[in-house]
Amino acid sequence: MFLLDTNVLSLLMTAQPPPEVGGWVSAQPPDLLFTAAICQAEILAGLAILPEGRRRFELETAARAVFLEDFEGRVLAFDSAAAENYAAIFAASRRAGRPVATIDLMIAAIARSHGASVITRNVSDFEGCDVAIVNPWTR
């Protein structure tokens, strides 16, 4: 099971995703590809601050289609199990003197509660979070 991080999803939504990412994602069985509602929120928030107009409307429409259609049933929520994992990861990173951004902690906690690998270019954001990390750019 793979949880696609926001940076991977953003690139997949472009007209021409980098071949490393597009190729890696295409090589995976679609039913193993998931994302998190946290990633959905990050993408929609980024689009919401764009100037109003046709471009923003088209991008928001395309992004919503990705989450509602392409990832239908495969957008993972931050639930009670994720909350428990969040607390454990937070405490471990704090003890190690290595703070992790809240959003990245939430994504890691969701992945950990589902036994998923995080697919990201931002490997350092998830190091020490006790989740498997895959960087499609280095595969």
Language model: regions and residue ranges:
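Acidic, PIN/NYN-like endoribonuclease modules and their adjacent C-terminal/linker elements
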Residues: 1, 108-139
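Residues that scaffold the ATP/ADP-binding catalytic core of kinase and kinase-like folds
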Residues: 11-12, 24, 46, 86-89, ...
